[in-house]
């Protein structure tokens, strides 16, 4: 996981003249980017015909026949 390190005075960027000195921090950076960039680069994107197609699902429910029968027996209301 990446960390953001706190800044210190020696890592501050100074701008402006000596009379009016402003400071801006530029030392916050990602320390470990290997997991960020190395995630799923080897996996290919799906082909156009495969997008939106679900894999086969097995429903293990003893009441599924009763539920489906009850849904098909009801007439749609308001039609």
From Swiss-Prot:
Listed GO MF terms: calcium-dependent protein kinase inhibitor activity; protein kinase binding
UniProt similarity note: Belongs to the CAMK2N family.
Domain of life: Eukaryota
Pfam families, sorted: CaM-KIIN
Transmembrane segments: none
Thylakoid found in the keyword field: no
Purpose of the protein: Potent and specific cellular inhibitor of CaM-kinase II (CAMK2). Traps Ca(2+)/calmodulin on CAMK2.
Annotated compartments: Nucleus; Cytoplasm, Cytosol
Signal peptide: none
Any one cellular-component term (Gene Ontology): nucleus
Organism: Xenopus laevis
Keyword Cytoplasm: yes
Region of interest (Inhibitory domain), ranges: 43-69
Name assigned to this protein: Calcium/calmodulin-dependent protein kinase II inhibitor 2
Keyword annotations from UniProtKB, A to Z: Cytoplasm, Nucleus, Protein kinase inhibitor
């Amino acid at each position: 996981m990446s960390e953001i390190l706190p800044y210190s005075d020696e890592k501050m960027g100074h701008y402006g003249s000596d009379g009016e000195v402003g400071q801006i921090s530029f030392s916050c950076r990602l320390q470990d980017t290997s997991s960020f960039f190395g995630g799923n680069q080897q996996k290919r994107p799906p082909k156009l015909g495969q997008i939106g197609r679900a894999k086969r699902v097995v429903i293990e429910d003893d009441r599924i026949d009763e539920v489906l029968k009850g849904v098909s027996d009801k007439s749609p209301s308001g039609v």
